[in-house]
């Protein structure tokens, strides 16, 4: 599984892993797993974390070594951003179902997610993703934006 990762990704994961391996013993605790993954741009839910930990932590000792961590990250990266998930996410933002995400729709969803954004910040997000310059985000632009992270 981990053999599908680039050397660069492996180096990045090793660096992140080391940051959280406080005592340098080559393992991280399960609590730290969520923090490590979030630092790498992943966003696992509590349930996903528990599942991953259960899969990886075979002896139930509450720690994960680097090879286990690598296979975990490889698995997680393979699962992210499927076409289906992107379509579902787009529908969440496109509240009126017209095929476009407006500034108002973006602001509404971001507010519901607990992100308090100024009008300027919302406009900036739209501008960054709005390839054709029509002031809103269509599905293609949304996919590009999501895959660029």
From Swiss-Prot:
It comes from the Eukaryota. Residues 8-43, 44-79, 81-116, 117-149 form the EF-hand domain. Ca(2+) 4 binds at residues 130, 132, 134, 136, 141. GO terms for cellular component: myosin II complex. The modification N6,N6,N6-trimethyllysine is found at residue 116. InterPro entries: CALM/Myosin/TropC-like, EF-hand-dom_pair, EF_Hand_1_Ca_BS, EF_hand_dom. SMART domains: EFh (SM00054), efhand_Ca_insen (SM01184). It holds the Pfam family EF-hand_7. The modification N-acetylalanine is found at residue 2. This is Calmodulin.
């Amino acid at each position: 599984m981990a053999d599908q990762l680039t050397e660069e990704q492996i180096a990045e994961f090793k660096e992140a892993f080391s940051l959280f391996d406080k005592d340098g013993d080559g393992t991280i605790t399960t609590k730290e797993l969520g923090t490590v993954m979030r630092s790498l741009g992943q966003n696992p839910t509590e349930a996903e974390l528990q599942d991953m930990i259960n899969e990886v932590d075979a002896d139930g000792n509450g720690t994960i070594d680097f090879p286990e961590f690598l296979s975990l990250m490889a698995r997680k990266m393979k699962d992210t951003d499927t076409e289906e998930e992107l379509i579902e996410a787009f529908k969440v933002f496109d509240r009126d179902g017209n095929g476009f995400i407006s500034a108002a729709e973006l602001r509404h969803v971001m507010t519901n997610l607990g992100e308090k954004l100024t009008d300027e910040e919302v406009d900036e997000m739209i501008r960054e993703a709005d390839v054709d310059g029509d002031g809103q985000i269509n599905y293609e632009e949304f996919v590009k934006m999501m895959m660029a992270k």
